[in-house]
Amino acid sequence: MMAMFEEVEVEAYVYPTEDINKVKKAMLNLVPGLKFEAFDKGEYMILVGKTRDKRALQRLYELFRGQQILDTARMMLEEGYFGEEIIIKVHKQVAYAGKVNFNEESPLGPITITIRTKEPQKLMKWLAPRTKDGVPIE
């Protein structure tokens, strides 16, 4: 896959009741190869992972197809598209189990994925093409 993005940033809040390594695993289940930094905010920590690895979005590509959620994924990408950024939020516990769920309503907050790209349309078409009867048509 050619590089259609400059950087992928993944962010989540980590609360005192949570294991930071489990939150890291949840984030890595979606975007492998992240380099992490943690910021202590007192009541919680903010965990930020970044990567410029050109294969960073391959896992999401596979999950969207494996879970047959291309239409939902496309809708979420389009909703989260602002200029040269695409932002999606996914459920943290579901990510820990190695799946994607766009229901971000979780007491522990979502995982936020920000894709920085100069070619957002091209990237969306690759990551989650439009479908007809579940089959990609782009």
UniProtKB/Swiss-Prot annotation:
Belongs to the UPF0201 family. InterPro entries: PAB1135-like, Ribosomal_uL5_dom_sf. It holds the Pfam family RNA_binding. It comes from the Archaea. This is UPF0201 protein PYRAB09730.
